[in-house]
Design a protein with these regions (language model features):
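Expand to "…catalyze enediolate/carbanion chemistry for C-C bond making/breaking, isomerization
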Residues: 1-287
């Protein structure tokens, strides 16, 4: 397992690029990353205007904004137009989210295309195809982060979006992201009128090893943030573990009736490092 020290968003708010006012308003919500969507949420005839909306929003966003843009699947003409727009403007989003990824070569191609234009965004991949799942270690090796796309994967598998139906894919993502030290973000919740379902799902994916969660509605941000963002109590507990193991000269220590040792200290250091990285990049106090 690779220690995770990079800044990983804990909440990503998806907003269709259908209205400039809507996109600008979304920037006011307390999300770590504000994503403008050019893919599924934008009908084909509206995609050209959606690109204009994204370009205007990017060029007028504050420098501290952590903006992402989800592009159309490579191999489509819409993806080509997306790339031309992104590489010809004066501002590039912090994150590019790819859709329907199947092979590592697609990610390498996109990264090299941006680099040729002097652009170096972080590239997150929507994991929603069987091909990506079955080659996940190689796919994750060329990514900066993974985002679970449950709807398309469930449609391909012919199963409903349930915890048991999606568990194998989620576990594979967590293992791949841990191996390569990259972010792992859970799928959006589609049962918007059932907050108890959302709360349970957030806790379950946190326990599984996910770092963040996507959402399509700002009303979910408070619950996502309160559960997944670094909190003072967790950071304090991690600090106490590292101190206890250090005092035991790197061996086994007893802390509040619990045995802790080197592996616990390594996890605690990861918690402290990732919390510090998150605060430096995403905390609104640094905006």
């Amino acid at each position: 397992m690779t220690d995770i020290a990079r800044a990983v968003p804990r909440s990503i708010l998806y907003t269709p690029a259908l209205s400039l006012n809507r996109v600008v308003k979304a920037l006011s919500y307390d999300a770590d990353v504000h994503l403008m969507d050019l893919e599924d949420s934008v009908p084909g005839p509206a995609k050209a205007e959606a690109r204009n909306i994204c370009r205007t929003a990017l060029d007028n966003a504050p420098p501290s904004a952590n903006i992402a843009l989800r592009i159309n699947a490579l191999g489509t003409i819409d993806a080509l137009h997306d790339l031309v727009m992104l590489c010809s403007g004066q501002t590039t989003p912090s994150f590019i989210v790819m859709s329907m990824v199947r092979t590592p070569a697609e990610v390498v191609f996109l990264r090299e295309t941006f680099a040729s234009a002097g652009r170096f965004p972080e590239i997150y991949l929507t994991i929603e195809t069987v091909e990506a799942i079955t080659d996940l270690d190689n796919v994750a090796a060329v990514a900066d982060g993974l985002i679970f796309g449950s709807a398309d994967l469930a449609a391909t598998l012919g199963v409903p979006i349930t915890w048991s139906g999606m568990l194998a894919a989620r576990q594979a993502m967590v293992l791949a992201s841990a191996r390569h030290g990259i972010g792992c973000i859970d799928t959006a919740n589609y049962r918007l009128s059932e907050p108890d379902v959302l709360a349970n799902e957030i806790q379950c994916v946190k326990d599984l090893g996910f770092h963040g969660k996507a959402t399509v509605h700002p009303s979910e941000l408070e619950l996502i943030n309160s559960t997944l963002r670094p909190c003072e109590s967790a950071l304090l507990a991690a600090s106490r573990i590292t101190d206890a193991v250090k005092a035991a000269q790197g061996g086994i220590a007893l802390l509040d009736g619990h045995m802790v040792g080197p592996s616990f200290a390594r996890m605690a250091r990861n918690t402290l490092q990732s919390g510090k990285a998150w605060a430096a990049r995403f905390s609104r106090g640094n905006s």
